[in-house]
Structures are given as structure tokens and as C-alpha cells.
Design a protein with these regions (language model features):
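Transmembrane alpha-helices
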Residues: 26, 111-114, 118, 122, ...
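Periplasmic/extracellular loop-to-transmembrane helix junction in inner-membrane transport proteins
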Residues: 1-26, 38-44, 84-88, 190-199
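C-terminal transmembrane helix and the adjacent membrane-cytosol boundary/short C-terminal tail
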Residues: 46, 108, 112-126, 130-131, ...
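Transmembrane-helix boundary motif in ABC transporter permease subunits
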Residues: 23-54, 67-69, 117-119, 124-125, ...
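Membrane-interfacial helix termini and adjacent extracytoplasmic/periplasmic loops
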Residues: 2-3, 66-103, 173-178
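Interhelical loop and adjacent transmembrane-helix boundary motif
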Residues: 1-9, 173-213, 218, 237
């Protein structure tokens, strides 16, 4: 019979995954919003290249992405060595490195969701606000942002779910250290290598599925609620 009682190591893996997913979502949101805006509204040489680079983690094997992160941000890498010597910041084999890996893997999903929302905005609404004297920042805050909020929510939740399930890039970049970098997927993988670990792996698998479904369903419901509120405000106006 499957028991839902988790061992301390399993709780560590679960809480670490939640922390990594939340942090990766938070640190990805500002740059994702900026990049999505640039890709949706700006025309410049190299735009296609930027779009390709943003979506590259979706195409590359996650292990390759993790290895590139290790080459760049490892203690001997050009960026990692500089961060370590200058600020004492180390990402490789730390939980913060797992945040970086999850953020990189979830970034394209967030950018795409926000970009589609920006492209769907009727530019005439923004132009009308501008003719009424609103500055560009005010137009963005009062007109554009409320309209693209469902896309932001959807992108953030997708990035969170991706962070919860990230495995290949994480284990390549930060390894499998109990209590430090052993996230939920890595814990499941580890348990499957141990005789008799199938029951614990099944528990964690069920939890991972439940959390992912909860995030996706919650995202859909929240996006619908925001859309209804926006339509209601438009009707009042």
C-alpha cells in the first residue's frame, strides 16, 4: 500500500524543488517581460537571432544546456570565476545554480506566453491613451499591463511548472547533492537506482504530478478570472 508519509530526505527534495521553482520564476519574470516586449514591438537587425537564442533551451538537450552553464558559470568558467573572485558568488553545485538552470529552461515558455499577449493588444487603445496625455510608462501601466496580465500569469506558472520538473540541466550543472541540489526529479531518479526505492519514487512522482496539475489548472482559472475582470471594466467604460 502506498503511504504518503515522506522521509526527511524526501521532504528536503520537495521543499527544495518548490524554492527553486519559485525563485526561478521570480528572477525570470522581469527579463522575460522585457525580451517579450522587444520581440513583439521592435524591429531591428538580429531580431530573428535573438528569438532563436531565447528559444534555444527548448531545442537543445537539457544536458547540453547544463553543460554550457557549467562551462560559463562554473568556478573555472569565465563568468563563474569572475563572480567568485569579485563578489564571492558561486553557482555550480549550489542550490542557487539549480535556480539558474530552472530559470534558463523555463525562460522561453514565459517569453512566448507574454509575447503572444502583447501581440494581441489593440495598439489603438494605447494610442488613444497617448493622445489623452498619458506618458509611455503610464500607458504601459494603465492600459497595456492589465491587458497582458493573463499572459504574464500563464507564462509565470508555466515557468514554475518547468522549474519543478527540471532534471537534465540541473543534474549536469549542480550535480546530485542531498539537501543542496537534490530536487524532486533528481530524488526520484536516485530512488530508482536503489533496490526497494520504487515505493518512495512513486510517492514523489504522485506529488510531482499533483503539483504540476495544480499549477496548470490554477493558471488557467486565474487567467480566466483576470480576463473576465478586464472585460467587465471595458463594459463599464
Amino acid at each position: 500500500m502506498l503511504t504518503l508519509t515522506l522521509t526527511p530526505l524526501e521532504w528536503e527534495a520537495l521543499t527544495l524543488s518548490l524554492r527553486v521553482a519559485l525563485w526561478s520564476m521570480a528572477v525570470s519574470l522581469p527579463p522575460a517581460l522585457a525580451v517579450a516586449w522587444v520581440l513583439a514591438r521592435c524591429r531591428f537587425p538580429g531580431r530573428t537571432l535573438l528569438d532563436g537564442l531565447v528559444h534555444l533551451p527548448l531545442i537543445l538537450p537539457p544536458v547540453v544546456t547544463g553543460y554550457v552553464l557549467l562551462l560559463l558559470l562554473g568556478t573555472r568558467g569565465p563568468v563563474g570565476a569572475w563572480l567568485n573572485e569579485t563578489f564571492g558568488i558561486v553557482f555550480a553545485f549550489r542550490w542557487t545554480g539549480a535556480v539558474v538552470a530552472a530559470a534558463v529552461m523555463g525562460f522561453p515558455l514565459m517569453v512566448r506566453a507574454i509575447r503572444l499577449s502583447i501581440e494581441a493588444v489593440d495598439s489603438r487603445l494605447e494610442a488613444a491613451a497617448g493622445t489623452l496625455g498619458a506618458s509611455p510608462p503610464l500607458v504601459f501601466l494603465t492600459v497595456t499591463l492589465p491587458l497582458i496580465l493573463p499572459g504574464i500569469v500563464a507564462g509565470a506558472i508555466l515557468a514554475f511548472a518547468k522549474g519543478m520538473g527540471e532534471f537534465g540541466a540541473t543534474i549536469t550543472f549542480v550535480s546530485n547533492i542531498p539537501g543542496e541540489t537534490r530536487t524532486l526529479p533528481i530524488a526520484i531518479y536516485t530512488l530508482l537506482q536503489v533496490p526497494g526505492g520504487e515505493t518512495a519514487a512513486a510517492r514523489l512522482t504522485g506529488i510531482a504530478i499533483a503539483l504540476s496539475m495544480l499549477a496548470l489548472v490554477g493558471s488557467e482559472l486565474l487567467a480566466r478570472h483576470i480576463s473576465r475582470r478586464i472585460r467587465g471594466l471595458d463594459a463599464v467604460r
